[in-house]
């Protein structure tokens, strides 16, 4: 437990209480009682700051009753497989303070459309998003899953066939199911990599067996299970040859590496804000071409039979507006850093491979993902190393979690010493080296051979 981290949180919370004072007071000024409360609060903040300087005092434990303080990003190195890319930037955290209220983005909404709001510049952000992923139009959505759903709802009718990877995320299955479609999986083979040839073979199989072509192809650039890179350029080429729309699933790529949907051959690009764009959940992006925008971003045409009301400015597949407050503003606040960090993807891969090389020095450790690594998310196999220790340790598999936590490392699947995942994205070189050394030190402690 880091007392300084806890004191920073404590000071922030006291300042929030003072902020609430102004939210409750009349705009003309504070009453005598409110002024006294304010001054007491300032004194309290001062005492906390003094404790912060000295590194002493009682550490707070909770945000509020029943809600534990979350400090894993400040007090630990977090290697959770799904969290690093969504770690908020300082700008996003500051923006949440100002725009955390429910409909905060709607203060000056003049047209009833999220992507038309000019202050804050949500309209400009949408245009930048489309350019960022190399497409023509974009919308923010409540997570990548809602992007999948918008596309399947627009393109798929009952009985239509959709190709997905045998490593696809469950939300792709559900998006097809809701639309009434039928799933056919593309095999990833023994290397766990989807190729353009495998997609073409599956299309031909579907054509022979079903007598028709698939209506949509949905393939991820990097899967969530292995973090392997799939041949999306090859898939895009095959999709064009057969005239089948291609949805590029960039949940683990958009926001951490350069992505250009048109160069890939995608008709739709879906990204995750909370997974890879340093944004609050649920958030994401759906981008498409001028060809498909009128379909997936179509306007509403329904009207009430009594009132005659209609909502032509709303987009049905998105259920109108999507991210109305802190979610979209966190995406916007982080976006300048996100645009810069994708340029450093090669360095992230260097760090990922450095760690894996060090990790493999421990005899019995294996990497289940493709190697060398092409992503920061990796699946590792420690059956012949740490799991051997777990079999006789009184804490079983939790011994590794205990040892890592003692070294201020969290995020691995607690209790797992067989096959598990980790993600090194965003860690500094100092943290990467510390992480690598920590595993080696644990191995040596339990007399595992280190090469």
Protein language model regions, located:
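N-terminal "arm"/small-domain region of PLP-dependent enzymes with the aminotransferase-like
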Residues: 3-112, 317
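Conserved N-terminal alpha-helix of the aminotransferase class I/II PLP-enzyme fold
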Residues: 81, 92-147, 153-154, 167
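Conserved PLP-binding catalytic core of the aspartate aminotransferase-like
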Residues: 349, 353, 365-403, 426
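Active-site phosphate-binding strand-loop segment of PLP-dependent enzymes
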Residues: 194-255
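Conserved PLP-anchoring active-site segment centered on the Schiff-base-forming lysine
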Residues: 154-170
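PLP-dependent enzyme catalytic core of the Aspartate aminotransferase-like
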Residues: 2-46, 204-205, 340, 406, ...
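Conserved active-site segment immediately N-terminal to the catalytic lysine
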Residues: 260-274
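Active-site C-terminal subdomain of aminotransferase-like
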Residues: 271-374
């Amino acid at each position: 437990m880091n007392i300084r981290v806890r004191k920073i949180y404590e000071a922030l919370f006291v300042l929030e209480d003072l902020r609430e004072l102004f939210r409750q007071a009349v705009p003309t000024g504070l009453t005598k009682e409110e002024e006294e409360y304010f001054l007491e609060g300032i004194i309290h903040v001062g005492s906390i700051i003094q404790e912060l300087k000295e590194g002493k005092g009682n550490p707070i434990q909770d945000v509020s009753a029943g809600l534990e303080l979350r400090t894993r990003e400040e007090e630990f190195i977090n290697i959770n497989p799904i969290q690093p890319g969504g770690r908020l930037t300082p700008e996003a955290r500051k923006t949440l303070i100002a725009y955390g209220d429910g409909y905060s983005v709607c203060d000056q909404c003049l047209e009833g459309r999220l992507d038309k709001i000019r202050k804050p510049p949500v309209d400009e952000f949408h245009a930048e998003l489309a350019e960022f992923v190399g497409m023509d139009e974009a919308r923010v959505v409540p997570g990548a899953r809602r992007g999948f759903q918008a596309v399947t709802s627009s393109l798929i009718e009952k009985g239509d066939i959709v190709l997905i990877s045998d490593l696809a995320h469950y939300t792709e299955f559900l998006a097809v199911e809701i639309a009434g479609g039928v799933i056919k999986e593309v095999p990833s083979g023994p290397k766990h990599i989807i190729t353009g040839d495998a997609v073409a073979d599956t299309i031909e199989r579907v054509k022979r067996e079903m007598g028709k072509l698939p209506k949509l192809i949905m393939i991820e650039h990097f899967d969530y299970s292995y973090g392997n890179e799939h041949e999306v350029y090859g898939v895009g080429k095959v999709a064009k040859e057969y005239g089948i729309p291609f949805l590029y699933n960039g949940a683990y790529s958009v926001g951490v590496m350069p992505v250009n949907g048109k160069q890939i051959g995608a008709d739709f690009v879906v990204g995750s804000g909370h997974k890879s764009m340093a944004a609050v959940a649920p958030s994401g992006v759906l981008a498409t071409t001028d060809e498909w925008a009128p379909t997936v971003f179509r306007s509403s045409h329904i009207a009430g039979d009594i009132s005659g009301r209609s909502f032509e400015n709303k987009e049905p597949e998105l259920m109108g507006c999507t991210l109305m407050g802190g979610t979209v503003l966190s995406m916007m606040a982080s976006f300048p850093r996100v645009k810069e960090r994708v340029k450093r993807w090669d360095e992230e891969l260097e760090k990922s491979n450095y760690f894996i090389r060090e990790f493999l020095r421990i005899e019995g450790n294996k990497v289940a993902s493709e190697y060398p690594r092409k992503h920061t998310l990796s699946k590792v196999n420690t059956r012949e190393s740490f799991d051997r220790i777990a079999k006789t340790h009184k804490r079983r598999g939790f011994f590794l979690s205990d040892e890592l936590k003692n070294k201020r490392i969290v995020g691995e699947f607690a209790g797992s010493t067989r096959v598990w995942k980790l993600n090194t994205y965003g860690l500094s070189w100092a943290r990467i080296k510390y992480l690598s050394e920590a595993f080696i030190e644990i191995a040596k402690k339990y007399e595992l051979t280190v090469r």
